Design a protein with these regions (language model features):
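Short, mixed charged/polar active-site loops
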Residues: 469-471, 509-514, 602, 606
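Short, charged juxtamembrane terminal tails flanking transmembrane helices
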Residues: 616-622
Length: 622
């Protein structure tokens, strides 16, 4: 076999690489500026943190502090999302991840990122990891685009050495939905699935020129057929939306330009389609028509959730709000939006497409308003003439709402005839990698074996007016992990925590553990309750979670599966005797690894300079 001569491809194809030259002084100047740019921020942060006397986290030192408590927390959070992780002690990978997360949380990062994003969006018309900037001022949620272009729900992604071995465990949509359908069927309940087409499916012309609507994933139709084959009453809205789109006047649209969601008019039309499907059921005539309503047309403004993903501070200064004429649905008896009714034969499960125009925190709300009452749930209840049992969670349409329904009580579930499950179609179409990036998790749910009291007259109450029905002291046993609030499509979130009961001060409670939901973050900022750690003893003033209107529909980070009554904490706080006293923590403790590292760097520099000096002295003079 003859030897092949290696050839330069540039010479072979007649291409000639460009030669760039620069003076020594220029190179030194640019090198120094570059080094200063990348070293000044971390140096300032390390110096600033090193000067603290009450609490201290110095990155350059903590990098060598392995293992530590934060590494344990990082491993615990990973294990909750993947049963494949068997190790009991944190590895170096856990440590590096924990350090990286703490560095990202640096205070100066926020202002730098904010200014950079402002320049990137205004000058280069680019978004970020969550937002894609389209044409004519339209913004698109990136996971919605990923749901149309990835492997999809039917073909598993190939494994790869480039994937994080500790990534959240992915469960395919079909087996999870099939099991949930079977669980409902065993209880005599029918499932109606309403996948809501996301904005790029219906308005792709604003994403890029030349794309025709409707835009579908290649496996979407096959997926829907498989779901129908399970006995699911699947409502495909695509054709209806395209018909309505054809009748639009110039300047009108079915979705909001700067928001993920549909317009109020589109929502009302979809509610009418779903209501007609429900009314066609043979048992609908026997449903108690127990809801009389009055309506109120108002105009509301909202800048859009995707604008909030691009800029956290004062989005209204640089972006124009969109105006919507909405119709509030109010219970004639109470003057408030229709309350969720545990005794209803119809349950509605949904994500933010159900919450928009109802939950003030995700748009179109007024200061001090706890519920708008113009969303999908209120509109559907009006059309059906009956109260619904409603479970919603922003970003939690795949698992959280099913889990909440399954845990609502054995007698509550068995009373149902129909579950209407409204979910963004992207969650049905995402494959593993984009699904994990979007925080979408598909999990099986366990149905509660407890019976609960069902109120005769459903009435929602506001948390500020509620008096605690149970006051106890609990020791935190386990808690759910929270996503980065800067990377989520929702601005607020609760999280679940499991407490061992130490003492009951008020009320009766027979269980040894309590499942409590606390605030995780508000306005995309972590709050004091987020800092509770396993082992903390906490005094809790509790009310049943379903009674609290102010948290209805808000995302709930919940990766605990305990068949217990769910409470909301009105006033959580560490017991006085367990609060750590403020004290000076003493001088810095320098890890040995850091000392050896510095010695090695200094030795390397000295040896390098010595070699260079000797070579210059030995070089012959021309």
């Amino acid at each position: 076999m003859s030897e092949q001569k290696m050839e330069n491809p540039y010479d072979k194809f007649g291409a000639h690489p460009c030669k760039v030259t620069a003076g020594r002084v220029s190179l030194w100047i640019f090198s120094i500026l570059f080094l200063l740019g990348i070293s000044i921020p971390p140096i300032l942060r390390n110096v600033n943190d090193a000067k603290k006397t009450e609490s201290r986290w110095v990155p350059v030192l903590e990098f060598w502090n392995f293992p530590n408590a934060k590494d344990d927390d990082a491993l615990a959070a990973k294990k909750k999302k993947s049963s494949k992780i068997k190790r009991t002690e944190p590895s170096l990978r856990d440590h590096l991840g924990a350090v990286e997360n703490e560095i990202k949380a640096a205070g100066f990062c926020k202002s730098i990122a904010k200014n950079d994003q402002k320049i990137i969006t205004s000058v280069f018309n680019e978004g970020n990891l969550k937002v894609t900037v389209g044409r004519d001022g339209w913004y698109f949620y990136q996971p919605g685009i990923d749901g149309l272009a990835g492997y999809g729900p039917l073909k598993a992604e190939p494994d790869s050495v480039t994937k994080d071995p500790d990534r959240p465990e992915w469960f395919a949509q079909l087996p999870v939905i099939e099991k949930f359908t079977k669980q409902l069927r065993e209880r005599g309940i029918e499932l109606m699935l309403v996948p809501v087409p996301v904005k790029p499916m219906i308005h792709p012309e604003f994403l890029s020129e030349g794309i025709k609507a409707p835009l579908r994933h290649r496996d979407q139709e096959a997926l829907y057929e498989k779901l129908r084959g399970m006995g699911i009453d699947l409502v495909d809205l695509t054709d209806d939306l395209m018909t309505w789109k054809a009748d639009l006047n110039e300047g009108e649209a079915l979705y909001l330009k700067q928001d993920t969601h549909w317009t109020h008019d589109t929502m009302e039309r979809v509610a009418a389609v779903v209501a007609e499907r429900v009314k066609a059921k043979s048992w609908y005539g026997d449903v108690a028509k127990n809801l009389e309503v009055k309506t109120e047309s108002v105009k509301r403004e909202w800048v859009g959730d995707m604008v909030n993903m691009l800029t956290e501070d004062s989005p209204g200064e640089n972006y124009s709000a969109e105006t919507q004429k909405i119709v509030r649905v109010l219970d004639s008896k109470t003057g408030a939006p229709p309350a969720s009714d545990l005794g209803s034969p119809i349950a509605l499960l949904g994500d933010s497409f159900v919450n928009v125009f109802d939950t003030p925190s995700i748009g179109f709300g007024k200061d001090g308003e706890t519920a708008i009452g113009a969303g999908f749930a209120a509109t559907l209840a009006k059309l059906l003439g009956t109260h619904l049992q409603v479970h919603t969670a922003n970003g939690g349409g795949a698992t959280d709402v099913r889990k909440a329904f399954a845990g609502s009580g054995k007698n509550v579930v068995e009373n149902k005839k129909l579950v209407i499950w409204t979910i963004a179609s992207r969650d049905l179409l995402l494959s593993e990698t984009p699904g994990n990036k979007a925080g979408v998790m598909w999990r099986d749910v366990q149905f509660s074996k407890r019976d609960v009291a069902i109120p005769e007259n459903p009435v929602d109450e506001n948390a500020p007016k509620l008096e605690p029905t149970l006051i106890l002291t609990g020791k935190l046993k386990e808690r759910s992990s929270l996503d980065d609030p800067k990377q989520t499509p929702y601005a607020e979130s609760l999280y679940s925590a499991l407490f061992d009961i130490v003492k009951v001060e008020k009320g009766k409670y027979a269980e040894s553990e309590a499942m409590v939901f606390l605030w995780g973050f508000k306005d995309r900022k972590f709050i004091a309750e987020t800092k509770l750690q396993v082992g903390d003893e906490v005094r809790l003033e509790l009310v049943p979670l379903p009674a609290v209107t102010t948290v209805k529909g808000i995302n709930k980070a919940d990766d605990l599966f305990a068949d217990l009554p769910q409470f909301f904490a009105l006033k959580p706080g560490l017991k006085e005797e367990t609060k750590p006293a403020t004290k000076v923590i003493g001088p810095l403790k320098i890890p040995c690894g850091f000392i050896f590292f510095v010695i090695g760097i200094v030795a390397y520099v000295i040896i390098g300079l010595t070699i260079q000096f000797r070579q210059r002295r030995a070089a012959p003079v021309a």
